[in-house]
Regions:
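Compact, well-ordered interaction domains used in eukaryotic information-processing assemblies
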Residues: 35, 41-44, 50
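Short amphipathic alpha-helix segments
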Residues: 21-39
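Interdomain "pre-motor" coupling segment immediately N-terminal to P-loop NTPase/helicase cores
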Residues: 46-102
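Accessory nucleic-acid engagement/destabilization modules that flank
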Residues: 1-4
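Proteins enriched for Cys/Gly/acidic motifs involved in redox and nucleic-acid/cofactor modification
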Residues: 87-118, 126, 130
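Hydrophobic side chains in well-ordered alpha-helices
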Residues: 33, 63-67, 249-252
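Short glycine-/aliphatic-rich beta-strand segments at the starts of folded cytosolic domains
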Residues: 6-24
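Conserved helicase motor core of SF1/SF2 NTP-dependent helicases
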Residues: 51, 110-120, 127-238, 242-317
Length: 317
């Protein structure tokens, strides 16, 4: 791959000729990839046929050359790209990370869908979960903390590295307590646990998930149900951990048994506890930050992988 360069009144113009297949990927559906590039780069990009023209001042053109070069390499190595890939490439280049090392780490596949890190921080998070007994993923909504942890849990179960998966959340959010909610226990906890079920349905066939649930191979339950237990040979995920008290956090972490792995996720900007109640997720880093076998991974709004508007909302708040 090589660019031809010509000086212009605006600075420099570079032209890259690519195959028709690569050109189609660089455009994207509805020009989505090209529009993402234009949004991120301070120069003009024009794709006509199989020729991509970049024009602007030298620093911006140089940045565009690097980003486009990475995208072309990804396409030629068999990757499908989209607007999100543009963000991944920018993040990797900014942090001197190998783009393929991030995108090629497929955590789980289901029905042809590959679940893999999309940002450098997500890749570090995946690596931390694999190498540590207890991992904390802390950051805004939409950064893939829980989803990636669940994909790793399903993969570990499939590979027989663990015998069961346990998913839990505090059942106290937005001022609601179980005792004051209508209905039986299942009806009471369902609204709190539904997001975890939604993710599981993305990763497993419904029949297999039902079988796992009936056998207790996968358990989804409120945090209160963990008290008094020792959880061996398990992959345990505590979601929405910002809504635990310090006492609940200690109780949960001491459930860890032999052959188990724990992931704790949460967003300390979305605490629903009473104002006078301390968050266990905020305190735990000060208490356990230097403890061997534990990892802490912090996400930022740059790691939000949902709709672009979600990232803007996170930034605004």
């Amino acid at each position: 791959m090589s660019f031809s360069s010509v000086p212009t009144l605006r600075g420099v113009q570079e032209v890259l000729s690519v195959s028709n297949d690569v050109a189609a990927e660089l455009a994207g559906v509805g020009d989505g990839v090209l529009d993402s590039l234009r949004d991120r780069l301070g120069c003009t990009l024009l794709l006509r046929g199989n020729r991509l023209t970049i024009e602007g001042d030298e620093p911006h053109v140089s940045e565009a050359r690097a980003v486009v070069g990475e995208l072309v390499d990804l396409v030629e190595s068999g990757h499908e790209i989209g607007p999100g890939t543009v963000d991944t490439v920018f993040g990797a280049l900014e942090q001197s990370e190998d783009v393929r090392r991030v995108l090629d780490d497929v955590v789980w596949r289901h029905r042809g869908k590959a679940i893999a890190p999309k940002t450098v921080t997500q890749k570090r998070y995946v690596d931390a979960i694999r190498s540590s007994t207890v991992t904390f993923g802390i950051g805004p909504a939409g950064t893939g903390k829980t989803y990636l942890a669940m994909a790793l849990a399903v993969a570990s179960l499939s590979d027989r590295e663990v015998g069961r998966i346990i998913l839990t959340r505090p059942a106290v959010e937005a001022g609601e307590r179980l005792g004051f909610l209508p209905g039986d226990m299942l009806a009471k906890v369902d609204p709190y646990l539904r997001p975890l079920f939604d993710a599981l349905y993305d990763m497993l066939d419904p029949d297999k998930l039902t079988t796992y649930m009936e056998r207790g191979t996968i358990e989804v339950a409120p945090l209160a149900f963990m008290r008094g237990r020792t959880l061996n040979d398990s992959f345990i995920i505590l979601d929405e951990a910002q809504n635990t008290s310090p006492e609940q956090m200690q109780m949960f972490l001491t459930r860890l048994g032999f052959g188990s792995k724990v992931v704790v996720t949460g967003d300390v900007t979305q605490i629903d506890l009473p104002r006078e109640q301390a968050s266990g997720l905020i305190q735990v880093r000060d208490i356990l930050g230097s403890t061997e076998g534990l990892s802490f991974v912090s996400f930022t709004n740059q790691d939000v992988v949902r709709h672009k508007l979600v990232q803007r909302i996170v930034e605004a708040y």
